[in-house]
Amino acid sequence: MPIRIDQGYKAFKLGDYCVNSRPGTGSLVSHMWYSLSSASIASAYWDTPTGEYRPFGPGYNRGAYPQDYGVTGPPIQGVHDSQQAPTGLAVDHEHNVYLTYPRNTGQTPSNVVICTSFNDEKPWPSAEIQNCTQGQDPSQCFVNVQNVVLDSIGQLWVVDSGIPYYAASGSDALYGGAKIMSFNQTGELIRTYVIPQDLLAHGMNANDVRINNTLGTNGWAFITDESTNSSVLAINLDDGSTVRRLFNTSVVRADPGYVGSYEGELIYCWNKTEKAYCTTGADGIALASGQVFWGVLASRRFYYISQDVLIDSSLTDEQVLAAVQDPGQCGSEQAGFTADDHGRVYIFASEQNAIYYVDTLQSELEMPVDDLKPGGTGLIPAKDYVVKTLVRNAMIQHADSGAILDGWLYFCTNQLELSPGRQYNHTDNRRGPFRSYRLWVGRGPAV
């Protein structure tokens, strides 16, 4: 099969069949030409043994066409279009969708909304709570809500970083502003838990929350801190006491010099034209099988630890760190996590336009792994975790937060990697509207 290179073209000659491409001039398809009939093409392969690959025949190679990045998994259904980029999502028992519009880079009119139609929203639980007034106690209003979640007894919780949009990067939160608040589904405030002031040091940045209503006397809340030093917090919902664990350890901190990838482009963090590396720590969080799962956003790592261990005040920080389980890398940044009632954890793989999953219970194994067989009992050891792809679709533009209800997995998207802080010279390459979706998984929320 002769190969010739001339005048910047590469020509691969198969008999009288030739495919030409000029490097750097665009899509390969636009530079392909076919000189003879398919019969001539076939004649060039007259000596190919039966059963081997032939051009454009059955079993032809992957990557034959530019559009060969296929769709994996079930179809996704749009449920709401947003004019701003949301980070948080919840769904109540009536299938109402709630979204949060954070104030990380600027003010937003409403921090938390309920969707009233495919395109419309209104402030939730009220317009008055959305913005703190001059001199108001920041524990009584929204400063910078990051997420909203539904717990197992029908309460909606918001997690507020307490860091105003005008604060310098790395600033500590306002005391009283960093908090979680519980509401019933009519929007009535039930209780506010303020994060103690001594735990706000080093820029503690509350990002996401999950609630276990059955742990302890009145339940516990688990919160990821996505600051550079990072940590995982736990709040006793009985008395409000709070612990901050794993502070500034490798299991919550970003990879040094981390560079992500999105749609084929490398992603740095930019200050105008000054290049930096993203340092976002523990971000997404889920509770499943008695464990707390979290991912480190500026990495491809995720971890888990027993909920009981994390809240045990008798254990030292060193003992808690030693109990952390490392299942290995998962091939993507992970912006959000959620879990279902079968012990499956869903990982929102932002770099891959995908949602992954991993089973944590042996009873849910789909195939033998090492010495484990499907239908077993107990937890799957970390070394035997196999992360799989649930869905991959070009419409999944950085899935961020998700929730499961009545068999549906809901999630929002926000194109984070295309936002000004991750684009050269603070260019905003996002294109709205920002759509939230759902897909069928046939399972209920984690309890």
Regions found by a protein language model. Name each.
Residues 99-105, 158-162, 221-227, 288, ...:
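Conserved beta-strand positions in repeat-built beta-propeller and related beta-rich domains
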Residues 110-119, 174-188, 234-240, 425-444:
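Beta-propeller blade signature
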Residues 12-20, 24, 28-43, 49-78, ...:
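Surface-exposed loop and turn segments in beta-propeller and other repeat-based domains
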Residues 135-142, 162-219, 224-225, 230:
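Asp-box/WD-like beta-propeller blade repeats and closely related beta-sheet repeat scaffolds
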Residues 80-93, 137-156, 198-221, 252-292, ...:
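Beta-rich, blade/repeat-based domains predominating
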Residues 284-310, 318-404:
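Loop/turn-rich, solvent-exposed surfaces of beta-rich toroidal or solenoidal domains
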Residues 100-111, 161-175, 273, 414-431:
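Short, conserved, GDST-rich strand-edge loop motifs in beta-rich repeat architectures
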Residues 401-447:
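Blade-level signature of beta-propeller repeat domains, shared across WD40, Kelch, NHL, RCC1
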